[in-house]
Regions:
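Charged, often glycine-rich, active-site loop that binds/positions anionic groups
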Residues: 90-105
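Catalytic cores and adjacent binding grooves of peptidoglycan-active enzymes
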Residues: 104-180
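Glycine- and small hydrophobic-enriched segments that form the cores of compact globular domains
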Residues: 44, 76-77, 96-100
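Sec/Tat-exported extracytoplasmic proteins
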Residues: 64-74, 87, 144-151, 170
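Acidic helix-start/capping segments at beta-turn-to-alpha-helix junctions
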Residues: 76-93
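Extracytoplasmic cell-surface/polysaccharide-interacting catalytic and binding patches
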Residues: 1-60, 64-71, 159, 167-180
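Extracytoplasmic/periplasmic, Sec-exported soluble proteins
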Residues: 48-59, 88, 106-109, 128-135
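Stable alpha-helical elements in mature extracytoplasmic
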Residues: 52-59, 63, 77, 92, ...
Length: 180
């Protein structure tokens, strides 16, 4: 999905871009703090802050949970996805643009609806059932594809920085589940 499509979806549920790191205390819409948990590992953040709107935080937890459930069904492996970016301010976007060719001034990360998940690094909580990075990447891609088809997220595969760029969608616009 293009940056324009991500931006249009993010505007529906996102926040106004923050003027600085303190302005998140005066928002018209709530944001929630994101921390490492059983569903995912939060990498050390340099160019973003650990906050998302509630819908994006819920989508991130669902991705992590589905990833771990799929691993279990396919023979096990105690791995978690690695989240590498969350909410950004205009200042952090400007700094990031000097290093990352994928970064743009109109970064949808500024709206609190978007996060990045690495497809090149996963967190192994134990080494009992080793899996290849390609296998883990494939499972993550399947989870993201399914959630995209359900209307829950938009996904962009980034190459320069090995990650999936994911934007949460408005729950009111998600596709109804088909009955079986």
């Amino acid at each position: 999905d293009s940056n324009y499509v991500h931006w249009a979806a993010a505007e529906k549920i996102g926040i106004e871009p923050l003027s600085d790191t303190r302005s998140h205390w005066q928002l018209r819409r709530p944001i929630v703090k994101v921390t490492t948990n059983p569903d995912f590992y939060l990498d050390t953040l340099i160019f973003s802050r650990p906050y998302l709107v509630p819908e994006a935080a819920a989508a991130l937890h669902e991705i992590g949970s589905r990833f771990r459930d799929t691993l279990e069904v396919r023979g096990g492996g105690d791995y978690r996805i690695k989240v590498t970016s969350l909410l950004r301010t205009p200042q952090t976007v400007k700094r990031l643009r000097r290093r990352n060719r994928n970064a743009v001034d109109s970064s949808v990360h500024q709206l609190g609806t978007t996060f990045d998940i690495s497809y090149a690094a996963f967190i192994a909580d134990n080494a009992e059932h080793p899996r290849s990075v390609d296998d883990l990447k494939g499972i993550l891609a399947e989870v993201l594809k399914a959630m995209r088809e359900e209307g829950k997220i938009l996904v962009k595969y980034e190459v320069g920085q090995p990650c999936f760029h994911i934007t949460a969608c408005d729950p009111k616009e998600q596709k109804p589940k088909e009955s079986k």
